[in-house]
Amino acid sequence: MSALEWYAHKSLGDGIFWIQERFYESGNRANIWLVRGSEQDVVIDTGLGLRSLPEYLYSSGLLRDRAARDNAACRPLLAVATHVHFDHSGGLYQFDRVAVHHAEAEALARGDNFETVTWLSDSEVVRAPSPGWRARQFRVQAVQPTLVLQDGDVINLGDRQLTVMHMPGHSRGSICLHDKDRKILFSGDVVYDGSLIDWLPYSRISDYVGTCERLIELVDRGLVEKVLPGHFNTFGAERLFRLASNYISKAGICHKVSTFAMRSLASLALRVTNSRTSP
């Protein structure tokens, strides 16, 4: 299957494109965002990486065609992972320039498929990307980040800037990217319109509460009008406020006890199926 078949996209205007993996039918299917700038283009999250995402970007015309890739006028391309979970980081190995938060840089560099929580089934991939492909073969490949991010860093695209916000809770290195001028938040799995997951090996409820308080502050200060999340549909500031507030209100003792049990089971299952280093 070609990259043009595997991916699909739609334009949200203002240089932003929403890309998805058509034949990965799962709640884990991540949104991939392309943000075009005057001096640099940024891909936010890369999906599973079962087909070449860079090839799709050039072949579909979203970026300059392959013949122009080495041209001095061709803008550089940076792939940013909002966190290293497999559904977001699987395609990072396809890019020359890769950025991730420092808390997860080591896990990515060694191909730690326990921390990337790799968990994929044949039933979720409704058309095999290549003959004989099986989900049990899938692993997140080790990638050495070329840019290690910290809270407050700014990724300069020329005519727009994306500010890095370290937002742990879902994972220890989760980030949002905030376009302050346009009041857009690329939220990864920090927040999306669904049940927030805080029971994975490196999830932490206390961190998540702090993150949600920070999200509420963004809304209260009028700094976010649109959220482009890591899963499901986009939403606005009012919904962001409600999702963050609901998480805080539910993060009591009962929730912590049930989450501890779920995390223990998830960690056991992931340790059985995944190694801490890439083969």
From Swiss-Prot:
A lipid is attached at residue 254 (S-palmitoyl cysteine). GO terms for biological process: fatty acid metabolic process. InterPro entries: Metallo-B-lactamas (IPR001279), NDM-1-like (IPR050855), RibonucZ/Hydroxyglut_hydro (IPR036866). It holds the Pfam family Lactamase_B. It is a lipid-anchor. It is found in: Endoplasmic reticulum membrane; Cell membrane. Its cofactor is Zn(2+). It catalyses: hexadecanoyl-CoA + H2O = hexadecanoate + CoA + H(+); dodecanoyl-CoA + H2O = dodecanoate + CoA + H(+); tetradecanoyl-CoA + H2O = tetradecanoate + CoA + H(+); octadecanoyl-CoA + H2O = octadecanoate + CoA + H(+). One of its GO terms (cellular component) is plasma membrane. Keywords: Acetylation, Cell membrane, Endoplasmic reticulum, Fatty acid metabolism, Hydrolase, Lipid metabolism, Lipoprotein, Membrane, Metal-binding, Palmitate, Zinc. The keyword DNA-binding does not apply. Zn(2+) 1 binds at residues 83, 85, 170, 189. The modification N-acetylserine is found at residue 2. Palmitoylated on Cys-254 by ZDHHC20. The keyword Endoplasmic reticulum applies. PANTHER family: ACYL-COENZYME A THIOESTERASE MBLAC2 (PTHR42951:SF4), METALLO-BETA-LACTAMASE DOMAIN-CONTAINING (PTHR42951). Acyl-CoA thioesterases are a group of enzymes that catalyze the hydrolysis of acyl-CoAs to the free fatty acid and coenzyme A (CoASH), providing the potential to regulate intracellular levels of acyl-CoAs, free fatty acids and CoASH. Has an acyl-CoA thioesterase activity towards the long chain fatty acyl-CoA thioester palmitoyl-CoA (hexadecanoyl-CoA; C16:0-CoA). Displays a substrate preference for fatty acyl-CoAs with chain-lengths C12-C18. This is Acyl-coenzyme A thioesterase MBLAC2. The lineage of its organism: Eukaryota, Metazoa, Chordata, Craniata, Vertebrata. The gene is MBLAC2.
